[in-house]
C-alpha cells in the first residue's frame, strides 16, 4: 500500500517534470528558429539589390530588427516564467528560402504553428501577446516585401 502510494507520487512528479521539460524545449526550439531566421534575413539583406526608394534591401534590414526584438522579448519572458536558459541553448535552425517572399511565408507558417501551441496557462499570456504583435508585423512586411523588386535565385 505505502509502496503503491509512493510510486504514484513519483509517477505524477515525473509527469510534471516531463511537462516542464517539454514546455521548456518547445520555447527553446522556437527561439532557435528565430535565430535561424535572423541569419537568413541578414543573408537575404546582404545579397539584395540596393536601389533607391522602396527596396528589399532596406525592408529586410527593418525586418531583422523586428525579428531580433521579438526573439529577445520571448527569451526574456521564457526565463521569467521557466527559469534561466542554458548558455548553449541557442543554436539557430537553418532556413533555406532564397528570396524575401518565400522567407516571410515560412516565418508566417511556423509562427502560426507556434502560436497555436502556446500553453493556455496565464503564465504564458505575455508570450502569446508578443506573438500576436509579431504576426501583425509578418503581415505588414509581407505586404511591404511584395511592393519591392525581389531578385529570384
Each language-model region and where it sits:
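Regular, well-ordered alpha-helical segments
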Residues: 43-46, 76, 147
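Helix-loop segments that flank and shape redox-cofactor active sites
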Residues: 36-62, 84, 114-126
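Generic structural signal for well-ordered, non-transmembrane alpha-helical segments
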Residues: 28-35, 39, 61, 65-72, ...
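Long amphipathic alpha-helical segments
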Residues: 80-81, 144-153
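Conserved alpha-helical segments that form or flank metal/cofactor-binding pockets of metalloenzymes
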Residues: 55-86
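Charge-dense, intrinsically disordered terminal/linker segments
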Residues: 1-25, 126-129
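Disorder-to-helix initiation segments
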Residues: 12-37, 97-100
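Acidic/histidine-rich alpha-helical segments that form the ligand environment
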Residues: 89-145
Amino acid at each position: 500500500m505505502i509502496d503503491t502510494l509512493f510510486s504514484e507520487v513519483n509517477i505524477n512528479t515525473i509527469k510534471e517534470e516531463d511537462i516542464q521539460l517539454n514546455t521548456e524545449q518547445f520555447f527553446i526550439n522556437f527561439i532557435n528558429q528565430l535565430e535561424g531566421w535572423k541569419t537568413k534575413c541578414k543573408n537575404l539583406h546582404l545579397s539584395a539589390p540596393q536601389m533607391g526608394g522602396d527596396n528589399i534591401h532596406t525592408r529586410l534590414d527593418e525586418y531583422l530588427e523586428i525579428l531580433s526584438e521579438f526573439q529577445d522579448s520571448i527569451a526574456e519572458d521564457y526565463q521569467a516564467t521557466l527559469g534561466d536558459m542554458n548558455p548553449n541553448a541557442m543554436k539557430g535552425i537553418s532556413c533555406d528560402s532564397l528570396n524575401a517572399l518565400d522567407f516571410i511565408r515560412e516565418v508566417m507558417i511556423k509562427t502560426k504553428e507556434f502560436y497555436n501551441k502556446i500553453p493556455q496557462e496565464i503564465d504564458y499570456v505575455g508570450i502569446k501577446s508578443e506573438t500576436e504583435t509579431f504576426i501583425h508585423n509578418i503581415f505588414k512586411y509581407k505586404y511591404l516585401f511584395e511592393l519591392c523588386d525581389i531578385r529570384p535565385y
